[in-house]
């Protein structure tokens, strides 16, 4: 058994030039958890996500995935859904599936095709012809069809209708293994709150708290959504 945390940030600082983005961030994320990474715009959420993915390097401090620093060898551990569309509208859905199949050795194309079928998405249509909701669902399907140990989802339900949000949350729950963890960054806290095991609150590049979601609700006698609104009502 691997004795290391799934994700470990050790006193991480990140500057963009002279501007600090993260200040002395330490995090310990264990397997089998769904974690909400919550904070106002510009708080440092996306910087943390990119550091874990190895897309940025810390100014100081250390980041480990199962005891190893982010590298090409750790790419199979993490499946990442960015907050912007990364697939060409001119490509067909089936081409996106084949791209993931060729690029990731832990991608389950059978699962992806079945999920697309469940949505009645024709794999031969071009991505640009899909509705916004179906496009976001398709991207999530691709990410969740990898047998990864950590799924990082940046605003996975932003800009879609409530019915689409429900589908996306169910897809997240049903397509992870009990030992895989999910980090969700979103502003739509009320929608994701029911599935969260843990909450990380961040502001101005600093971690304010990292706690069990149920314990937070009991401690403050309010929902995570209300706690967030009260904490950041002036931001």
Residue spans for each PLM region:
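ABC-family P-loop ATPase nucleotide-binding domains
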Residues: 83-139
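Catalytic Walker B motif of ABC-type/P-loop ATPase nucleotide-binding domains
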Residues: 151-155
